[in-house]
A protein has these predicted regions:
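N-terminal acidic leader/helix
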Residues: 1-33, 56-61, 65
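Residue-level recognition of hydrophobic positions within alpha-helical transmembrane segments
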Residues: 5-6, 47-51
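A generic structural signal for ordered secondary structure
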Residues: 20-21, 43, 49
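Charged, low-complexity interaction regions
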Residues: 32-44
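Short glycine-rich, low-complexity/disordered patches
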Residues: 42, 64-67
């Protein structure tokens, strides 16, 4: 795993802890706005962050079911 992936996952976990699962939707909305206003690299970074948050949330849901 690259340093950028690790940093993205860490930030996603912090955002989930502070803002709950709704942060995934907000990140996707922000990515759409960034893309629409001509900032494709920012949009891609926000999508990566949203994906990392969603993956972490889904892993947590799976762990709860197994407990």
């Amino acid at each position: 795993m690259s340093a950028l992936q690790t940093m993205t996952e860490d930030l996603a976990l912090q955002m989930l802890a502070q803002n709950g699962v709704a942060v995934i939707w907000r990140l996707n909305l922000a990515a759409a706005e960034a893309h629409r206003t001509g900032h494709p690299q920012s949009a891609a970074a926000l999508i990566d962050l949203a994906d990392a948050a969603e993956d972490a949330w889904l892993r947590a849901q799976g762990e709860r079911r197994l407990s």
